[in-house]
From Swiss-Prot:
Stored PANTHER family: 7-METHYL-GTP PYROPHOSPHATASE, BIFUNCTIONAL DTTP/UTP PYROPHOSPHATASE/METHYLTRANSFERASE PROTEIN-RELATED
InterPro entries reported for this sequence: ITPase-like_fam (IPR029001), Maf-like (IPR003697)
Pfam families: Maf (PF02545)
UniProt family annotation: Belongs to the Maf family. YceF subfamily.
Superkingdom of the source species: Bacteria
Name of this chain's protein: 7-methyl-GTP pyrophosphatase
Cystine connections: none
Any one GO cellular component localisation term in the record: cytoplasm
Function: Nucleoside triphosphate pyrophosphatase that hydrolyzes 7-methyl-GTP (m(7)GTP). May have a dual role in cell division arrest and in preventing the incorporation of modified nucleotides into cellular nucleic acids.
UniProt site (Important for substrate specificity): Y17, Q75, E159
Keyword Magnesium: no
Keyword Transmembrane helix annotated: no
Cofactor field: a divalent metal cation
Length: 197
């Protein structure tokens, strides 16, 4: 294991979900909000958007903390050629879940880690295919009322009741669907002072 350092590990996110995930690794870290424009660019697909936003968040925090390790991440969801964002309202969540029911949605969980040692970025994007059950309007409204997934891409929380919406999940990293791909993160942190084991 590399020796400890005076550098900090900073998660470029205020997401309680991602913070809880990072805590699983038992690493000391702080958070910093990376307020950026998260609009989708013309011609950009869901994966490109997630990768770009994760990198932009990382670089924004790295400008202020050039001697620290920075973890940036972003997640988007794609249904055919439609990018599903955070719904923000119950009606938008309802419409998203109606679109998703009985279909497969691909989630892109992008990770970008900045290393102060060599000023390099390590980037990764994990795909997760989620097949939704057939759902009726009543089931969808009940779910939204019970879990209020208004701040989640795709309008569900897979770590909670949202799992009941699914028929199956396919991914190389089961943690990615929550928002922070921990397997890729552990790989990125190898040979750093923040190697988990």
């Amino acid at each position: 294991m590399p020796s400890r350092t005076s550098a900090n590990l900073i998660l470029a996110s205020q997401s309680a979900y991602r913070q809880a995930q990072l805590r699983q690794l038992g690493l000391p870290f702080t958070t910093a909000a990376a307020y950026i424009n998260e609009e989708v660019l013309t011609g950009e697909n869901a994966q490109q958007t997630a990768v770009r936003l994760a990198k932009t968040k990382t670089l924004k925090i790295a400008k202020e903390h050039a001697n620290d390790y920075i973890i940036g991440c972003d997640q988007t969801a794609g249904l055919d050629d439609i990018i599903l964002g955070k719904p923000g309202t119950e009606e938008n969540a309802f419409n998203q879940l109606m679109q998703c029911q009985a279909r497969t949605v691909t989630f892109y969980s992008a990770l970008c880690v900045y290393s102060p040692e060599n000023k390099q970025l390590i980037q990764h994007c994990t795909q997760t295919k989620v097949s939704f059950r057939e759902l009726n309007e009543s089931q969808i409204r009940s779910y939204i009322q019970r879990e209020s997934p208004l701040d989640c891409a795709g309008s569900f929380k897979c770590e909670g009741l949202g799992i009941s919406l699914f028929e199956s999940i396919q991914s190389d990293d089961p943690s990615a669907l929550i928002g922070l791909p921990l397997i890729a993160l552990c790989t990125a942190l190898q040979h750093t002072p923040f190697q988990p084991i």
